Amino acid sequence: MSVPKFNDLSFYSDPSAHKSRYANLVKTFKSKYPNDEIEFFARSPGRVNLIGDHIDYNYFPVLPMAIEVDVVAAVSTNNNDMIVIANTDSAKFPKETVSLAEEFTIDREHHTWANYFKCGLIVASKFLQEKAMTKLKGMNITFSGTVPTGGGLSSSAAFCVASTLAVLYANGVEDISKADLTRITVVSEHYLGLNNGGMDQCASVYGEQGKALFIQFKPQLKGTPFEFPVKNLTFVITNSLQVSNKYETAPIHYNLRVVEMAIAGDLLAKKLNVEGKEGIVKDSNVDTYSLRGVMDGYCGAWDGEDLDVGVVHLEKMIDVVGKTLTKEGGYTVEQCCEEMGLTPEEFHSRYLKKIPVKFDVLKLYERALHVYRESLRVLKTLQLLSTVVDASQFLQTFGSLMNESQHDLDILNESSNPKLNEICSIALANGAYGSRVTGAGWGGSIVHLTTTENLPKLTKSLEAYYKREFPGITDEEIREAVIDSKPATGSCLVKLDFSHALQG
């Protein structure tokens, strides 16, 4: 299945609502590059994860959906040895230049928006080299983004995917499969030092209008669209306005979770005699046993399709974690070394050298338990989707699963906080069936399950919260912070004739 191409805005639920934005993008492009004509637009959306957070990098399936906020790149090509990138928000994202005559490098100490573009450029150039296309074209690009940065809706993934798509199409890749675009962009943010899984990129690429996604990582990466059985169901996404920059806080938040889960995987593998078992490899981002790999080694390989088998295996692992990782509240490095038979030097070299992290103790029990319990909730949601139930029962059951997820994100994964919990409580008291932090957490956004009938009461209560919590906030800022969203179209290309129509 290829990334689709459009000659209009029909991929939006309300095309007319986006026309002025594209007109502004064209106007800004012409002001930056007066001698150029836009050849095409490359676009990729943000995403909201409905259930299944901090489990994708352990290769357990997740249930996100693409949303209509997105990143759009207006592109022209030339024969210069440089790429110039600009933005409609030039005050926040000033014009930058990337030389094609030099090796692409990312200075992690110098944090700039061009680094994200370079992530897309690097993976695109590697893909082009695989196709024996080594000479890159110069490009002039202007970006427009509506995904809030640091809002937990994958603005960075949307930007990296749109950048990758722009570079590929500009260099003659007229037809790229969704599978290839996902495969190469999954690792794009690794160049910034973020050890993410593949959920964000896959959701951005595979999104379909009106459908959420079941994303699997084993035995292969794929996204399967599905529809909800309740027609009046809708999701409200609230930006907490607590900016969560995954890269700046990675050593104490996101990357620390990756490391804790990696160590938990190795310790479980050792204690459960999975270590060295035939067919079970060290497949995590940090070359350890993943928690999915441990489950497959201990319970038997799961094909990712038979939900009943997956449920049995996960329930078994939840029981095993409680009996095996016995130090609730955290392990010291010394305790880890003792249980794993390693010296402190060996432990540091194996687990703490590749990814810089900061901690007092390593909460292996809590993190592993979260992964297995959250993964079980994903499968129970899928089972619910395949069961004939009335609308009320579906909403109540799915809402309960979302609320259980929020509890574990707060208590076991510690990626929520009191203010996020307060927003969830307000929503649940005013028409939401389920509310949970979505994405990396530590700020960002919350997703609420509700119905069209309950929508006015829910949004009114959330608007009141913002006015109380943020005196002076404008109505426009509230509208941007509280959005109801249906599932949206994923990555796509929009052709040149449309830009002419906009200028007319």
UniProtKB/Swiss-Prot annotation:
GO terms for molecular function: ATP binding; galactokinase activity. ATP binds at G150, G152, S154, S155, S244, N245, K246. It is an enzyme of class 2 (transferase). Its EC number is 2.7.1.6. The record marks R47 as: Transition state stabilizer. GO terms for cellular component: cytosol. It catalyses: alpha-D-galactose + ATP = alpha-D-galactose 1-phosphate + ADP + H(+). It comes from the Eukaryota. The keyword ATP-binding applies. SUPFAM superfamilies: GHMP Kinase, C-terminal domain (SSF55060), Ribosomal protein S5 domain 2-like (SSF54211). Pathway: Carbohydrate metabolism; galactose metabolism. The active site is at D200 (proton acceptor). Keywords: ATP-binding, Carbohydrate metabolism, Galactose metabolism, Kinase, Nucleotide-binding, Transferase. It holds the Pfam family GHMP_kinases_N. GO terms for biological process: galactose metabolic process. Alpha-D-galactose binds at R47, D53, H54, D56, N196, D200, Y254. InterPro entries: Galactokinase (IPR000705), Galactokinase_CS (IPR019741), GalKase_N (IPR019539), GHMP_kinase_C_dom (IPR013750), GHMP_kinase_C_sf (IPR036554), GHMP_kinase_N_dom (IPR006204), GHMP_knse_ATP-bd_CS (IPR006203), Mevalonate/galactokinase (IPR006206). Belongs to the GHMP kinase family. GalK subfamily. Galactokinase is a key enzyme in the galactose metabolism where it catalyzes the conversion of alpha-D-galactose to galactose 1-phosphate. Can also induce the transcription of the gal genes in response to the organism being challenged with galactose as the sole source of carbon. This is Galactokinase. It comes from Candida parapsilosis. The gene is GAL1.
